């Protein structure tokens, strides 16, 4: 087939025998990798039989795997996702990497699922295993396991980026789930933490749109009430880059007053640049701009408008 003209070959699927990295190796530069992500909320909603609010609630809990989007009952969705997580993802990772059992990597997935949007690294996770699991899983093994989870497209890693220093900070970092439904299934749908899940969804959406997404760190100096010069550090949830374009995005579930708005936008002020700055909130609101040019937009409005970053 490789010798025939006008013929494209698509090799699909990843399993314990053949991951996408193996496909690229086999074709030795003659092929391209296309990462097929779960459905975006816009895609999910286009086929959803219900209101926008109902669709988002479903999407947050059960994610965007196409098979799930076609299922009618919550029981069907939850059973399917739990089975996929246990009998497909975990089993394939164990088989692929010749692990002796699934216990350690399963426990690691549980810990990571409970801590989405939190800064972490292998050393911190090693300490968690010691204190919570009474286990001695070393940092180097944890780092290796995280690599396996990324290779299987279960997790995605967001590095920290020093905005003013223009450099990456290797550790700690954040890990997000490629699909929130799989994350929730791993925890048997017990921890539906809307604040963290919304952040995960925004991260995934930015990647769907083709952006490289980092966690922003802004360091600055500030004088205390006593006049002492101190160094401070604030975080921007996401720095989205694509070529010469950059956007700063904060995920804020609720902004009840001006004080909370100031807290969320303070990191924007410290960047000292003119890139677009956006705060996404859970409440359904049309885009609005303050006197500094910062935009507030509702999560559903943000997800359903492909041009929402440029409003």
Predicted region positions:
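Sensor-1/coupling segment of RecA-like P-loop NTPase cores
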Residues: 2-24, 149
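Domain-level recognition of nuclease-like catalytic cores that cleave nucleotide substrates
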Residues: 283-311
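Interdomain motor-coupling "hinge/lid" segment immediately C-terminal to the ATP-binding subdomain
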Residues: 14-16, 20-119, 123
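Active-site ExK catalytic segment of metal-dependent nucleases
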Residues: 241-256, 264
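Short, polar loop motifs at secondary-structure junctions
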Residues: 16-18, 280-287
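Arginine/glycine-rich "motif VI" loop of SF2 helicases in the C-terminal RecA-like domain
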Residues: 266-275
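A short alpha->loop->secondary-structure connector
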Residues: 1-6, 25-33, 237
């Amino acid at each position: 087939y490789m010798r025939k003209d006008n013929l494209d070959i698509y090799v699909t699927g990843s399993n314990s025998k053949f991951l996408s990295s193996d496909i690229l190796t086999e074709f030795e530069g003659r092929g391209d990798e296309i990462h097929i992500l779960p459905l975006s909320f816009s895609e999910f909603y286009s086929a959803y039989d219900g209101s926008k609010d109902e669709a988002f609630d479903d999407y947050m809990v059960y994610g965007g795997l196409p098979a799930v989007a076609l299922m009618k009952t919550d029981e069907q969705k939850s059973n399917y996702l739990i089975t996929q997580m246990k009998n497909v993802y975990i089993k394939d990772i164990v088989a692929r990497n010749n692990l002796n059992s699934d216990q350690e990597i399963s426990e690691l997935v549980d810990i990571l699922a409970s801590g989405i949007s939190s800064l972490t690294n292998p050393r911190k996770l090693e300490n968690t295993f010691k204190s919570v699991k009474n286990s001695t899983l070393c940092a180097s093994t944890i780092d290796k396991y995280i690599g396996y989870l990324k290779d299987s497209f279960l997790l995605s890693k967001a590095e920290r980026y020093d905005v003013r220093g223009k450099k990456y900070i290797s550790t700690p970092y954040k890990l997000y789930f490629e699909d929130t439904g799989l994350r929730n299934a791993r925890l048997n749908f017990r921890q539906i933490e809307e604040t963290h899940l919304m952040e995960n969804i925004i991260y995934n959406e930015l990647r769907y749109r083709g952006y490289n997404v980092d966690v922003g760190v802004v360091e600055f100096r500030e004088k205390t009430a006593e006049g002492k010069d101190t160094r401070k550090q604030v975080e921007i949830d996401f720095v989205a880059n694509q070529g010469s374009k950059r956007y700063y995005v904060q995920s804020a579930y609720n902004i009840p007053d001006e004080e909370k708005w100031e807290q969320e936008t303070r990191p924007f002020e410290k960047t000292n640049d003119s890139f677009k700055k956006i705060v996404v909130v859970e409440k359904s609101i049309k885009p609005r701009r303050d006197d500094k040019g910062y935009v507030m937009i509702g999560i559903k409005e943000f997800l359903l408008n492909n041009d929402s970053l440029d409003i």
